[in-house]
Amino acid sequence: MKQSKMLIPTLREMPSDAQVISHALMVRAGYVRQVSAGIYAYLPLANRTIEKFKTIMRQEFEKIGAVEMLAPALLTADLWRESGRYETYGEDLYKLKNRDQSDFILGPTHEETFTTLVRDAVKSYKQLPLNLYQIQSKYRDEKRPRNGLLRTREFIMKDGYSFHKDYEDLDVTYEDYRKAYEAIFTRAGLDFKGIIGDGGAMGGKDSQEFMAVTPNRTDLNRWLVLDKTIPSIDDIPEDVLEEIKVELSAWLVSGEDTIAYSTESSYAANLEMATNEYKPSTKAATFEEVTRVETPNCKSIDEVAGFLSIDENQTIKTLLFIADEQPVVALLVGNDQVNDVKLKNYLAADFLEPASEEQAKEIFGAGFGSLGPVNLPDSVKIIADRKVQDLANAVSGANQDGYHFTGVNPERDFTAEYVDIREVKEGEISPDGKGTLKFARGIEIGHIFKLGTRYSDSMGANILDENGRSNPIVMGCYGIGVSRILSAVIEQHARLFVNKTPKGAYRFAWGINFPEELAPFDVHLITVNVKDQESQDLTEKIEADLMLKGYEVLTDDRNERVGSKFSDSDLIGLPIRVTVGKKASEGIVEVKIKASGDTIEVHADNLIETLEILTKK
């Protein structure tokens, strides 16, 4: 493909509105352009990468018997009313009316549609399992689109749905998808973790998220690609290294979620679901009496602990929530933070939100900072983190402004349900006892759910079993954010290319090192002087030879300065660069492997053999 025929509008500078490096580079390198807020056009390079990722998915899904189809994006609202999600999905749902004033939506996901199609076609267990998927644009009315393709109003998604006679059958397909996802993301060159996830609005029973790990900004060996003029990072002057560090830190660490993972095992979970090893501790032998003490102007845990000269871990934090219109008290030790998702899941609540101080005063008779679990009405449910049960002679609010209780003991002074509702901390022991927990930012790229009968129950999707009894179909749901894969790949494969000029000045510039399977082309063939006939002839020969061997070639035939061509090449990020330059008359070209920065001169007749050795193909 001739570059002069392609739409690749590269920019000389980073876009001013970009905050994450993936957004900046995909715009600057000419992969995408924003049409309006949260809506992007995928230009030829991006489209080629996305199509390659689709090919990987199709190949892996075929192995597990998943069949591709295509459902409409424009959906009748009646289907969503049938499932109950039309009212509960929230403001992200695009709602519209046709000329007859009938209600429609633009689909953000397609559980209802697939359930209806299968409900109307499948009547017996003998017709199951069914494993269907589609690759399609989805729509969500994001309040604040941001970070390029990571938070958009229109996005490309692979959503799959499986249908089963029972949970045992679902478990088999769920495991097939888990392995397929691992194969897909591995082939795509992504550093990812499969983590314990939250079903959220999808209504899942069990779920696993797949997160692309966002690299930190401190490892220079990971970020820098050195030109042949620079032997190693140690040869870069300290002042230049400081400039590089400033440039790296200027970009936000991308990722909407924090991952907690073990340093020594495969354990990994979204921070919302992460837990740690818990071993009950021994309580004090003697319990003190509850005593009310004055704590003037002390509202925070730190203030109370300081005033009473005690360790903060000897205090009970009392929080008030409203869960489905009912008050719920959450108790934690000291400065532990409540994990809203854990609490909501334990309560099986549809809605959970912190109570207002006015509500607290109505229930407790006191404001925030003086709340406690002692002498609460029986109608108030108390959920305590499991660490609270290990406390003895603790301090809690006295439900009177300006006062606290000392000598508070669980079970004797209050009754609670004990469960893990705290947010884990970095450095704590992994729940499997292997290694400690570390945190990283992550981009969600996939999610699999065991939906169970959530949709088949509400929509009447039933089958007759072996005994002629009618049972709801058991479902699974499997999503991959196809368009955000482009962001994740660029986030992980962005690099700073560093070189030294003939005068000894150091230069560095951003670019991409695409993994081979997702690169829009395999080889960037650059002609330094397009007006030189020998160069042109050699370029055409090399292009033909490469294509004959199955290489996809982008040939830069533009009449541009060589510096501009090399700059664009670094931005575009193809794995191999072949330059036809000053030695064209001798048949010699320069080959550069982008990932390592290694360069070598070879004769054109030996180019294919050399590439096979260098790329280990």
Swiss-Prot record:
GO terms for biological process: prolyl-tRNA aminoacylation. It catalyses: tRNA(Pro) + L-proline + ATP = L-prolyl-tRNA(Pro) + AMP + diphosphate. Keywords: Aminoacyl-tRNA synthetase, ATP-binding, Cytoplasm, Ligase, Nucleotide-binding, Protein biosynthesis. GO terms for molecular function: aminoacyl-tRNA deacylase activity; ATP binding; catalytic activity, acting on a protein; proline-tRNA ligase activity; transferase activity. It comes from the Bacteria. The keyword Hydrolase does not apply. Its EC number is 6.1.1.15. It holds the Pfam family tRNA_edit. It is found in: Cytoplasm. Gene3D superfamilies: Anticodon-binding domain, Bira Bifunctional Protein, Domain 2, YbaK/aminoacyl-tRNA synthetase-associated domain. One of its GO terms (cellular component) is cytosol. CDD domains: ProRS-INS (cd04334), ProRS_anticodon_short (cd00861). PANTHER family: MITOCHONDRIAL RIBOSOME PROTEIN L39/PROLYL-TRNA LIGASE FAMILY MEMBER, PROLINE--TRNA LIGASE. Catalyzes the attachment of proline to tRNA(Pro) in a two-step reaction: proline is first activated by ATP to form Pro-AMP and then transferred to the acceptor end of tRNA(Pro). As ProRS can inadvertently accommodate and process non-cognate amino acids such as alanine and cysteine, to avoid such errors it has two additional distinct editing activities against alanine. One activity is designated as 'pretransfer' editing and involves the tRNA(Pro)-independent hydrolysis of activated Ala-AMP. Homodimer. Consists of three domains: the N-terminal catalytic domain, the editing domain and the C-terminal anticodon-binding domain. Belongs to the class-II aminoacyl-tRNA synthetase family. ProS type 1 subfamily. This is Proline--tRNA ligase.
